[in-house]
Each structure stands twice: as structure tokens, then as C-alpha cells.
Design a protein with these regions (language model features):
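A cross-kingdom marker for long, charged
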Residues: 141, 145-262
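Generic serine detector
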Residues: 9, 13, 24, 73, ...
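Surface-exposed loop/turn and secondary-structure junction residues enriched for glycine/proline
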Residues: 7, 26, 31-34, 38, ...
């Protein structure tokens, strides 16, 4: 409740008036109706989740498989994870052309707000819940590798989702990343961004906003994309299990073992 709506605690004066006002807001009422209508039938998502969680269970035998729910959050957090359950904010997956999105989100945000990515975000949310980030959140390398691990595993679990879709990129942007991977990596190294604990700089690499501080063509979240390439290299070099992949927490050691050469 409180975490979803950004409301005060029930003890605060006027709390219930605030709740009533929130849910009476016309835009939210329309959003709720549209979301319930869009997700009246979810067989496609159930089938994807069945395959995806079966893959996770095969590779993480001790992992508990959560009960999966849906909710309307009013454009708040995409996925909520709690003990043995996950809930997806379906109002964030209405399709990039959904009219209400036009006033609230940029193009680079709307491209991710697709029904086809719902199952992927369930899986990513659960992996993050089961294997929370334990590095230094201000160090780019730590964040890149962690986010890259999540993308790598979700793509293995749901291979029908293309890497470009999983990143929230247009195909042309993904192809640009592939063609410019070496230049991107060299730029990060030359600017000494990889190991320097700088929260502001690190967050720029992981924001959905286009990374124009690197070049005009660089799409957003480029840190995650490069992290994914490092993880792919690590898995080719080490033939590790996915459990070993998630348990390797030392990012510098991981990079060394990956022998990443874009």
C-alpha cells in the first residue's frame, strides 16, 4: 500500500481522505478500467511465465517460485516483490501508443511499456529479489555487471524476446551499439568512469534517458548493455553455471575472468 502509492501512514491526519482523493482522480479511474480490460485474458503471459520459471527452477534448484499477481499502481513501480509473491503494475504495460502515456512518459520510456515485456520483468524482478545487489552502487563496474547478469539470464529464459526488445531499444539503436562497442568501452576506460565511485556519473550510464554525454547516438542504459556483453564473455570463457554466475560478487575479478575484448 504505502510503498505503491507514496502515501503517508494511516496514523497521519487526513490519510483516508488522501486515499479516497487518489482513487477518485478521473485519470486514475480511466487508467484502472483500461488496464483491467487489457489484462482480462493473460494466457500469453501465463505461458511465458511457465516456461521462464521452469528455466529458473532448472538452473536454481533451491529457488522458490513465487505466486504472480497484477495490480494498478498509478504509474508507480513496475514490479513489487515480497516473500513468495510478485505483483506487476499492469498500467505500466499498456503499449507504447496508449494515449495516457503521451503526457507522462518520453519515447524512450514508452518503448519498454509493452505487454510483450511483462513476463521478462516478472523474471527480472524475482531474480533481483532472490539475488539482491551487493556491490557498491556508486561504482559503474559493479552496477553494470549486476544488471548485465539479470539481462543475460532473462534472455536465456525467454529467448523469443530479442536483445533489442529486452533493452528497450529500436533495432537500429541496438545495431549501433554492436558496431560501436569498442569505442564505447574505450571511452569509459579513458574517462576513468569504470572504477571511480561517482553516483551521478554511474546513474547516467544506467538511466533510460539517451546517453548523450557519450555521443548523440548512444541510447540509454548503455551501462547495462555493456554489462550484458561482459557477462556473455564471462560465460563463454568459464563455462560456469548460472548459480556460479550470480554468486560471483567481485566485479573486478569477474571482469578479469571474463577476458572481455570488444
Amino acid at each position: 500500500g504505502k510503498g505503491i502509492l507514496n502515501l503517508q501512514s494511516p496514523e497521519v491526519s487526513g490519510f483516508f481522505d488522501q486515499v479516497i482523493a487518489y482513487y477518485s482522480e478521473p485519470t486514475l479511474k480511466n487508467l484502472y478500467k483500461d488496464a483491467v480490460r487489457e489484462y482480462d485474458h493473460v494466457t500469453d503471459i501465463e505461458n511465458q511465465l511457465g516456461k521462464g520459471f521452469a528455466f529458473l527452477k532448472a538452473n536454481f534448484p533451491n529457488m522458490q517460485i513465487p505466486a504472480c499477481y497484477m495490480h494498478v499502481s498509478g504509474f508507480n513501480q513496475n514490479v513489487l516483490a515480497a516473500d513468495s509473491l510478485l505483483s506487476l503494475s499492469i498500467d505500466k504495460y499498456m503499449g507504447e501508443a496508449y494515449p495516457l502515456y503521451q503526457d507522462f512518459f518520453y519515447d524512450y520510456q514508452r518503448i519498454k511499456m509493452q505487454r510483450t515485456l511483462a513476463a521478462a520483468d516478472y523474471l527480472a524482478g524475482w531474480l533481483m529479489s532472490e539475488y539482491p545487489f551487493e556491490g557498491n552502487e556508486n561504482i559503474l563496474l559493479d552496477r553494470m555487471i549486476y544488471e548485465g547478469k539479470i539481462k543475460y539470464i532473462v534472455h536465456l529464459a525467454l529467448p523469443e524476446i530479442t536483445p533489442a526488445q529486452l533493452m528497450g531499444y529500436q533495432e537500429k539503436d541496438y545495431e549501433w551499439c554492436v558496431a560501436n562497442e569498442l569505442t564505447l568501452w574505450n571511452t569509459i576506460i579513458q574517462r576513468k568512469h569504470l572504477y571511480t565511485p561517482d553516483q551521478i556519473t554511474t546513474s547516467k550510464y544506467l538511466d533510460d534517458k539517451p546517453c548523450t554525454f557519450l555521443s548523440d547516438e548512444t541510447p540509454g542504459n548503455i551501462g547495462t548493455w555493456i554489462g550484458w556483453q561482459i557477462v556473455s564473455s564471462y560465460m563463454k570463457e568459464n563455462n560456469a553455471s548460472l548459480q556460479t554466475l550470480m554468486q560471483q560478487q567481485n566485479a573486478q575479478e569477474f571482469l578479469s575472468q571474463a577476458k572481455y575484448k570488444p
